[in-house]
C-alpha cells in the first residue's frame, strides 16, 4: 500500500517495476522534506491529478523548468546547502526508471557527499557566528 504522491509512475500505471521504484519514492520523500512539506504540483487538490500531471509529457528537464518557473526549485536550492542534494532528488525522481539511480548504494554515495558538504558548511557557519560575537 502506498500513497499516489510518492508512487513511481510505472507502479501507478500497473507496469513491471524494479528497485528503482523504491528509489523514486525515496526521492519524493526527500523532495517533500526539502520543500517545506510540499509536493510537486501541490496547488492541485487530488493526488491522482498531481501524479498524472507529473507523468503526462514531462521530461526531467521540463519538470525542472516548471519547478523553477513556480519558484519551487529556487526554494529547494535555498534550503539545500549544496546543489548535489537537488540533483540527487531530481535523479531519484526521474520519470524514466533508467534515468534514476539503479541502486540505493549509488544514491547513498551522493547523499553522503551532500551530508559531508552540509556539515562542513554548518561548522564554518558556526565558527563564523562565534567569531562575530567576539
Task: Enumerate the predicted regions with their spans.
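Conserved catalytic-loop aspartate of Hanks-type protein kinases
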Residues: 22
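Conserved end of the kinase activation segment
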Residues: 11-19
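Regulatory extensions appended to serine/threonine kinase catalytic cores
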Residues: 119-134
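Conserved HRD-motif arginine in the catalytic loop of eukaryotic-like protein kinases
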Residues: 100
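Structural helix C-cap motif within protein kinase domains
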Residues: 35-39
Amino acid at each position: 500500500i502506498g500513497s499516489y504522491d510518492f508512487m513511481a509512475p510505472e507502479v501507478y500505471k500497473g507496469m513491471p517495476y524494479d528497485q528503482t521504484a523504491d528509489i523514486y519514492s525515496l526521492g519524493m520523500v526527500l523532495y517533500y522534506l526539502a520543500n517545506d512539506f510540499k509536493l510537486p504540483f501541490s496547488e492541485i487538490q487530488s493526488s491522482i491529478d498531481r501524479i498524472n500531471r507529473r507523468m503526462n509529457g514531462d521530461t526531467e528537464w521540463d519538470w525542472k523548468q516548471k519547478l523553477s518557473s513556480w519558484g519551487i526549485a529556487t526554494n529547494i536550492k535555498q534550503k539545500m546547502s549544496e546543489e548535489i542534494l537537488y540533483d540527487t532528488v531530481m535523479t531519484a525522481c526521474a520519470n524514466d526508471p533508467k534515468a534514476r539511480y539503479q541502486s540505493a548504494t549509488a544514491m547513498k554515495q551522493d547523499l553522503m557527499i551532500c551530508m559531508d558538504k552540509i556539515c562542513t558548511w554548518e561548522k564554518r557557519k558556526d565558527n563564523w557566528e562565534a567569531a562575530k560575537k567576539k
